[in-house]
């Protein structure tokens, strides 16, 4: 259910494309929109620019999470994608993912969780400090979340050029794939924006993940938590 990409931007842009294709195929949406907080990563706007979606930005509240009332007002029949961040980049705050996913599901839209920063932190923070650092459910355990992105080359500690996008199902994943057989060269199928890709970044990421393992990531997250507490 996952595809490998070269970084957060590519993972996010692929999520935008998949959401647009799903909205077209399943709901006949012709003027697709993305609903996202003003704190969401700029790559969502890049994806909207590349794939012809309108963005509907909503404000954040005093605690830097998305204003759910404003988001509910922005979601509608043209919504292809609703965005949650875990965490968002500017302040490091996790959005209320369950509530956002519910808004998306209410109109049949996709919900992408940008966990490019938190994907290799939140699972282990919840183990180490469940009361102080644990977060409400933010991943595919949340009904209505259709895809997640996580960067191996950020707090997964792998070399640059390694990210993943994980879809809830194979059915949803196929909306990300470009499949074309209308030319003289045969079938052309790509799961992301690139054609030819090097396997080196993912081989290096695999080695790092195997080396660190669950215990290694727990130690690193514990160290980060202790440092944050001291600061």
Question: Where are the regions a protein language model picked out?
Answer:
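Conserved beta-loop-alpha segment that forms the PLP phosphate-binding cup at the N-terminus of a helix
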Residues: 1-28, 43-47
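Short acidic, glycine/serine/threonine-rich loops at helix termini
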Residues: 14-17, 45-50, 93-96, 121-128, ...
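PLP-dependent aminotransferase-like
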Residues: 24-78
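Active-site-proximal loop/turn and secondary-structure-junction residues that shape catalytic pockets
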Residues: 40, 88, 117-119, 154
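Active-site phosphate-binding strand-loop segment of PLP-dependent enzymes
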Residues: 66-115
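Active-site pre-lysine segment of PLP-dependent enzymes
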Residues: 68-70, 94-106, 118-147
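Active-site C-terminal subdomain of aminotransferase-like
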Residues: 131-231
């Amino acid at each position: 259910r996952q595809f490998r990409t070269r970084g957060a931007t590519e993972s996010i842009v692929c999520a935008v494309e998949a959401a647009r294709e799903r909205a077209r195929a399943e709901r006949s949406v012709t003027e697709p929109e993305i609903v996202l907080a003003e704190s969401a990563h700029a790559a969502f706007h890049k994806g909207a620019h590349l794939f012809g979606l309108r963005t509907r930005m909503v404000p954040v509240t005093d605690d830097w999470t998305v204003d759910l009332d404003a988001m509910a007002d922005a979601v509608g029949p043209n919504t292809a994608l609703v965005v949650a961040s875990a965490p968002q980049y500017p302040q490091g705050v996790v959005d209320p993912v369950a509530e956002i996913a519910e808004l998306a599901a209410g109109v049949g839209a996709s919900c992408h969780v940008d966990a490019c920063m938190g994907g290799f932190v939140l699972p282990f923070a919840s183990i180490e400090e469940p009361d102080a650092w644990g977060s409400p459910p933010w991943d595919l355990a949340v009904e209505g979340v259709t895809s997640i992105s996580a960067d191996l080359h950020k707090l997964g500690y792998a070399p640059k050029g390694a990210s993943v996008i994980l879809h809830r199902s194979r059915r949803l994943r196929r909306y990300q794939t470009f499949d074309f057989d209308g030319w003289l060269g045969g079938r052309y199928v790509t799961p992301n924006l690139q054609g030819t890709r090097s396997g080196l970044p993912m081989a290096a990421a695999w080695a790092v993940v195997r080396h660190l393992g669950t215990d290694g990531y727990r130690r690193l997250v514990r160290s980060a938590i202790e440092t944050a507490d001291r600061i």
